[in-house]
């Protein structure tokens, strides 16, 4: 049985939107570099805030003899750093990087990024570009299938996205708890609806936000579980959620990221599941990579957030990684697989 409750829009009115990156071009047709700065927090950090930086650009042929052929868009994250440099200075330095791209494979297709030029301003982010980084290709590239192996590839930075982490605390991505399942527990999930302006280009912005197309994603927050064998009622869970005083915002961690802050009282069990943190971040890069790629340059705004209460998936259910095939007596048998939609 699934129960759904709507949050009031005041919970995301202040920082529940991200401005678009509108492309402009030089006279010869090349994109003009731009920087986008996002601050999803309340700004209560007293010292200089940390910044999370991502790059967005074009994967193209590295051919010095002819005009480069663009193959795909890419967006590798550089991670968190502390810097007093202006965003425009960081953008200029990023566009001067000579980043090599190589396609490879492991459990899934990968893209390797590494830089061949010395870094000056982006020193806090030195490790990722200089030592090289390997990413799940579908998380950082919109068309890895078009990236050739027989032609050297480079990554030309066009945009940078900077997310100021101005909260007086720590952001936590509770990865270890996202697949946690428990008997007689109620899973607390959030279903978020975004309005997206997918039209990119001059004069194509839709003024009426109500007309924008919508997309949804779901994140798992935690489980409500009693010590006894009984299960909490949906009304009790709703009361616990209301006590938490949740506030929502959109940031740019790993592309686009919902940020959740609890301003009220949280149950001890749920607080422990979240690592005793009240400021959470769920990068869409990990949750919904297809939607994340769509939002790389788009304007988006939270239209609706709902609390979804569902029974926790039984531990006996097998997930995709547990598929077993045996050929005893010449017969192939695959165990029935259930992919849980919540933890």
UniProtKB/Swiss-Prot annotation:
<comment type="similarity">
    <text>Belongs to the morbillivirus/respirovirus/rubulavirus M protein family.</text>
</comment>
<protein>
    <recommendedName>
        <fullName>Matrix protein</fullName>
    </recommendedName>
</protein>
<dbReference type="Pfam" id="PF23765">
    <property type="entry name" value="Matrix_Paramyxo_C"/>
</dbReference>
<dbReference type="GO" id="GO:0020002">
    <property type="term" value="C:host cell plasma membrane"/>
</dbReference>
<keyword id="KW-1032">Host cell membrane</keyword>
<keyword id="KW-0945">Host-virus interaction</keyword>
<dbReference type="InterPro" id="IPR055413">
    <property type="entry name" value="Matrix_Paramyxo_C"/>
</dbReference>
<dbReference type="GO" id="GO:0019031">
    <property type="term" value="C:viral envelope"/>
</dbReference>
<dbReference type="GO" id="GO:0039660">
    <property type="term" value="F:structural constituent of virion"/>
</dbReference>
<comment type="subunit">
    <text>Homodimer. Dimerization is critical for virion formation. Interacts with host ANP32B.</text>
</comment>
<dbReference type="GO" id="GO:0016020">
    <property type="term" value="C:membrane"/>
</dbReference>
<keyword id="KW-0468">Viral matrix protein</keyword>
<dbReference type="GO" id="GO:0019068">
    <property type="term" value="P:virion assembly"/>
</dbReference>
<dbReference type="InterPro" id="IPR000982">
    <property type="entry name" value="Matrix_Paramyxo_N"/>
</dbReference>
<keyword id="KW-0472">Membrane</keyword>
<dbReference type="InterPro" id="IPR042539">
    <property type="entry name" value="Matrix_C"/>
</dbReference>
<comment type="function">
    <text>The M protein has a crucial role in virus assembly and interacts with the RNP complex as well as with the viral membrane. Associates with phosphatidylserine (PS) and phosphatidylinositol 4,5-bisphosphate (PIP2) at the plasma membrane. Interaction with PIP2 triggers matrix protein lattice polymerization. Matrix proteins induce host membrane deformation and curvature necessary for virion assembly/budding.</text>
</comment>
<dbReference type="Pfam" id="PF00661">
    <property type="entry name" value="Matrix_Paramyxo_N"/>
</dbReference>
<keyword id="KW-1043">Host membrane</keyword>
<keyword id="KW-0446">Lipid-binding</keyword>
<dbReference type="GO" id="GO:0008289">
    <property type="term" value="F:lipid binding"/>
</dbReference>
<keyword id="KW-0946">Virion</keyword>
<dbReference type="InterPro" id="IPR042540">
    <property type="entry name" value="Matrix_N"/>
</dbReference>
<keyword id="KW-0261">Viral envelope protein</keyword>
